Amino acid sequence: MKKLMMILAGTALMVTSAPAFAGNDRPIAVGELPATAQQFIKAHFAGVEVSLSKVDEELFDKDYKVVFVNGAKVEFTKNGEWKDVECKYGEVPAAIVPQQIRDYVAKNYPDRKITAIDRDRRDYEVELDNGLGLKFDLKFRLIDIDN
């Protein structure tokens, strides 16, 4: 019985303390971003003022988000690699988009701009200014279209 009470008390302690580790969002200075993220901002968003930069610390993960005054947003991994770029009122800088994806969009949607790009371990997703979503595998082959 004593053992059961100890297990229950330990479980209750873990459950009540878990929220303290999850979702710890806090603003940070741009200088606190990983060096890779700072270099990315200087290379692709030079001259655009940062409105907000923040870190989101989860129990086993951390990521960063930067919002610019022009409405653009960039999310970075814990290592400072970009994972999501959204340019609400403009176009994603061309140098961010892999050449094969730019070529595909230019050929098949010549009057469209890429307004967002997202990448992960499995694929790239881009959104065009008409709301059309295109998904590419890591070899840049189109694998899905989302209207």
Language-model segments: which ranges?
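Hydrophobic helical h-region of N-terminal Sec-dependent signal peptides
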Residues: M6-L13
